[in-house]
Amino acid sequence: MASEPPSSPPGAGATLEDTLGWYKSQYEQLESELAEFRDSSRELEQELEKDIERAEKQERHHQEKAETLGFEVEEWKRKYRESKTEASASQNALEKEITTLRDTNRTLQLKLRDIEVANDDFERQARNTTSSLEDMESKYNQAIERAVMMEEEIKIGEQEREQLRIESQRLREELGDLKIEAELLQDKFKKQESRHLSTISTDLSVLASPTFDGHPASPGSTASSPLITTPTDSKSMTEDGDTLSELPDPPSPPMSDVSAPLPKVAASRPSAHRRTVSRSRLPSTDISTTPLPRSKPPTATTRAPGSRISTGGTTTMRTPAQRAVGPRSASNKLPTSNSLTHIRTLTAQMQRLEARVHSVRSKLPGPTRTPPRASPRTNVYSATNMPASITIRSRKRTSGSAASSVTGDDPTPTNIPTSTPKGSHVPRLSTSGVSRLSFGPLPNRGGPDEISRPSSRASTSYATSYARPPSRAAGEGIPRPISRASLTGVRTPMGRSRSSMGFHGHSASISSHLDLEEQDEGEFRTPSRRGTYSSQGGEVSGSGIPMPATRRRSGSRRISASTMRSSVSGPPRKQLSDLGETY
């Protein structure tokens, strides 16, 4: 212990006791560390012994498991050898069975072929019987479906027609009420104007007095009277687009009030000045108020404007009185009253209502949607003597609006001839849309070729076929459920050829009904007023509803093959064949 001094002994100047004390402390420290090391090594040995015992136990367990698995491997090897032997034996047996079954199948196929050859005659007889039965069933089902479809379409068409008729009648009554209100307001305005004219006439002197200028047509003419000022031509000559002038002249009185013209105060004034002044008047009521007959038998009278029927005699048109508009005083001129504004508002309302009426009329079903109905008053007048109270409506709508027949730029004429040609119509002139309500004829600006009907669609496809007639939804896009009977024929099951249903020898009555129904499509339907006689070019016997014809001669109207060919080649002459009652 003394031979191995510590690494850091005390210094040379230390005493022996200090050196000895330091060595003792070092010895004690090393002794304690040695005791701790012995304790820890003992614990480590115990843990290592435990680990060794545990490893030995695991080794014994793994050896036992390996022996067990070896026994299992030997068992599976034995089972595999046995299963392989059994599989080879079963495979040989199955191959023998397959060979036997193939021979049996070949024998059975030969027998089945012989049986099929023997059974062909019976199947042929059964097919003939089944085809005959199915042919009769298809014909019967087609007839039933056609009848049901036609009845349903007729019901739907009648309901739609009744609803639209009620709607159009209601709108027509509203138009009539507004017309009466406008007439009352115009009567009030006329009375006020006559009162104003009488007031002015009291202030005017004799025609030769110096109140008037010697040359009224000169542009610089002025009045010598301090109360009267003569308007110049530059002021009176308004443009064509002017609707109202500063002189609030009333319109002419209605047809029932036609009497002697108003007293001409200044009858010797030039006609040019009279024309320039009369151009700025409100629209006269001689044409646009009440419907005028074109040409009738000359044995009737002209009814009052409140009457619902106008079957008057010869065409009586009132020529508006050429009132001389004398120079007026600026102090006596009427201000812009509320009545003019109210009249303009009423006329605008009437135009809107007429537009609604035309929109409703455009939604009316055509003749293919509503069967033609024979009117009890259709043959009273011919098509050439059609009364002017009938509005001819075409599906093409080429004539424009019937609310205001002439553009608003046209001035109101002061001289209208009192007689018109027999086949023409009376144009209803108005100023800038300020027109009276009228159920008169539409202006047919073209010849009779414009109003001829288009060629029938049914004449090209149903001239020789008795297939189901096209429904009203066929040309107008309304979806319908597709029935088993299609538009061209019946689908025969089992792939057989179609029977003689579409090409049998029935009479042409069905085709003629279809052609008549399509012929009415291009004609002008005339929703006449209550009590107005309708005009029809030809006679339609019976109810006019297309019904299936029998094999024999039917009592309905027939269309020959030449008529069908003419309907295909081009439009025929004008024929107003569907002018039914609309009330």
UniProtKB/Swiss-Prot annotation:
Q: Locations of Low complexity compositional bias?
A: 453-469
What keywords appear on the UniProt entry?
Answer: Coiled coil, Cytoplasm, Cytoskeleton, Microtubule, Transport
Ranges where the record places region Disordered:
34-68, 211-339, 358-583
The GO biological-process annotations, alphabetized, read as: centrosome localization; chromosome segregation; establishment of chromosome localization; establishment of mitotic spindle orientation; microtubule nucleation; vesicle transport along microtubule
- Biased-composition ranges for Basic and acidic residues? 35-67
Q: Which domain of life is it from?
A: Eukaryota
CC terms in the record's Gene Ontology section:
cytoplasm; kinesin complex; kinetochore; microtubule
**Coiled coil, from the record:** 14-195
| Entry keyword annotation includes Cell division | no
Biased composition annotated in UniProt, kind: Polar residues: 219-235, 279-319, 329-339, 379-392, 399-422, 529-538
Cite the InterPro entries for this sequence: NUDE (IPR033494), NUDE_dom (IPR006964)
Q: Which Gene3D superfamilies match?
A: 6.10.250.1080
One function term, GO molecular function aspect:
microtubule binding
Member of which family? Belongs to the nudE family.
What do we know about how this protein assembles, alone or with others?
A: Self-associates. Interacts with PAC1.
Cite the PANTHER family for this sequence. NUCLEAR DISTRIBUTION PROTEIN NUDE HOMOLOG, NUCLEAR DISTRIBUTION PROTEIN NUDE HOMOLOG 1
Q: What is the official name of this protein in its record?
A: Nuclear distribution protein nudE homolog 1
Q: What is the lineage of its organism?
A: Eukaryota, Fungi, Dikarya, Ascomycota, Pezizomycotina
